[in-house]
Amino acid sequence: MAVPKRKKSKSRRNMHRSHHAIKPKNIVVCATTGEFMLPHNIAVDNSYKGKRVFIKQKAE
């Protein structure tokens, strides 16, 4: 089992954790609806990059 030879100082501990912060999500505005959404996802109205992707069919 690996055991540290020396105690890691508060400064070095915090420098090690500097990349652990939560980054803000990238939010874009939908071209068709104008709503906020995550990039590379289908919008609420089933459009992607301004084009309809899924067309709802009537239940038979």
From Swiss-Prot:
GO terms for cellular component: large ribosomal subunit. This is Large ribosomal subunit protein bL32. Belongs to the bacterial ribosomal protein bL32 family. Pfam families: Ribosomal_L32p. The gene is rpmF. Keywords: Ribonucleoprotein, Ribosomal protein. One of its GO terms (biological process) is translation. SUPFAM superfamilies: Zn-binding ribosomal proteins. One of its GO terms (molecular function) is structural constituent of ribosome. The keyword Ribonucleoprotein applies. The keyword Ribonucleoprotein applies. Residues 1-23 are annotated as: Disordered. NCBIfam families: rpmF_bact.
